[in-house]
């Protein structure tokens, strides 16, 4: 199937431009059963480049690199997730474990012990109440007091809490090797979980497959092709935020050839400084130009795809204001 797409301000714009605006617009070939509508705003040349790279066997599918799943659902973060002040108030130092509760708490492409300690000092909610799957009578006095405080607030009556055998115990599965941003503003990102913290469902958790170097994956994730592709996979709503469910994150593709040449620390430093252009210039030169032999024009085309689609959804955010 082919389609023409014309963007107009309003009906008066259509009247002023007339039928010629349609006649002068190129046809685009799209698979309407699979392709999302956002691809309609790309040129035929851009679509062809994406299609070619999406079928390039030299680029790795996410499912060959990692598993991804939703973060922990507590049922009541106001009870289970707390800051240092609450830990000290209820004397729960032996009853909490590290957790990341918001994507804003992650600045680079790795969560280090230093990062976590800085979050504690800033008063962020990075402690998770984990008394264990014990009968109430077997808990410590401090744990009992905190649970009773929570019941006084009615937290135990929330749906996710009341359907548990013990409302104050949240089951935990595997510990994440890394996190993926679930709701991205400018672009998605993978963050290595060096602190071995839990994560709430505001982010996704990642477990690397056997023999996969997670540092290489996190470093290679930030390249212009992967960011351009992500704009066609995620869902954007009125606020301009790009949202990914685990299924969409499994469709991500990452050029991993020569990823062992990337300097993770350099990428992390630039990311923390907000210098994504430096990151992409660096990673593209190795992953796209040197490894995949893409031309300067093709890399510029990928950058155009990413910026065009990112700017489009961000403009909707500004219109909402």
Task: Label the model's feature ranges.
Residues 1-42:
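Internal, well-ordered domain-core segments that constitute the primary functional module
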Residues 2, 100, 310-314:
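Intrinsically disordered, low-complexity sequence elements enriched in Ser/Thr/Gly/Pro
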Residues 3-7, 178, 254, 280-281:
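Generic low-polarity alpha-helical segments
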Residues 8, 14-15, 23, 246, ...:
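S-adenosyl-L-methionine
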Residues 14, 202, 276:
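Short, mixed-charge aromatic SLiMs
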Residues 22, 32-37, 41-80, 142, ...:
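Non-catalytic DNA-recognition/assembly elements of restriction-modification systems
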Residues 38, 46-269:
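Polybasic, glycine- and aromatic-enriched phosphate-binding surface used to engage nucleic acids
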């Amino acid at each position: 199937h082919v389609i023409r797409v014309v963007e107009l301000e309003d009906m008066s714009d259509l009247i002023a431009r007339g039928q010629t605006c349609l006649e002068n617009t190129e046809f685009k070939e799209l698979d309407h059963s699979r392709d999302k509508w956002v691809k309609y705003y790309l040129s035929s040349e851009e679509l062809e480049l994406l299609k070619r790279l999406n079928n390039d066997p030299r680029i790795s599918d996410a499912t060959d690199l990692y598993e991804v799943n939703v973060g922990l659902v507590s049922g009541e973060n106001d009870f289970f997730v707390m800051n240092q002040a609450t830990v000290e108030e209820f004397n729960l130092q032996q009853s909490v474990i590290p957790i990341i509760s918001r994507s804003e708490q992650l600045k680079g492409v790795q969560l280090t012990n230093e990062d976590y300690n800085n979050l504690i000092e800033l008063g962020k909610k990075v402690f998770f109440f984990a008394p264990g799957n014990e009968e109430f009578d077997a808990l410590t006095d401090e744990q009992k007091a905190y649970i009773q405080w929570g019941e006084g607030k009615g937290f135990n009556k929330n749906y996710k809490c009341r359907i548990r055998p013990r409302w104050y115990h949240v089951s935990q599965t595997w510990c994440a090797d890394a996190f993926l941003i679930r709701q991205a503003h400018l672009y998605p990102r993978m963050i290595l979980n060096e602190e071995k913290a839990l994560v709430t469902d505001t982010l996704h958790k990642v477990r690397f497959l056997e023999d996969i170097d997670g540092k290489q994956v996190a470093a290679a994730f930030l390249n212009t092709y992967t960011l351009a592709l992500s704009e066609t996979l995620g869902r954007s709503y009125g606020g301009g935020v790009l949202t990914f469910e685990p299924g969409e994150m499994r469709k991500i593709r990452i050029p991993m050839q020569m990823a062992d040449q990337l300097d993770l620390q350099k990428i992390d430093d630039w990311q923390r400084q907000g210098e994504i252009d430096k990151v992409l210039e660096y990673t593209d030169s190795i992953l796209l130009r040197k490894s995949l032999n893409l031309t300067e024009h093709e890399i510029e085309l990928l950058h155009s795809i990413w910026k065009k689609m990112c700017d489009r959804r961000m403009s909707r955010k500004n219109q909402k204001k």
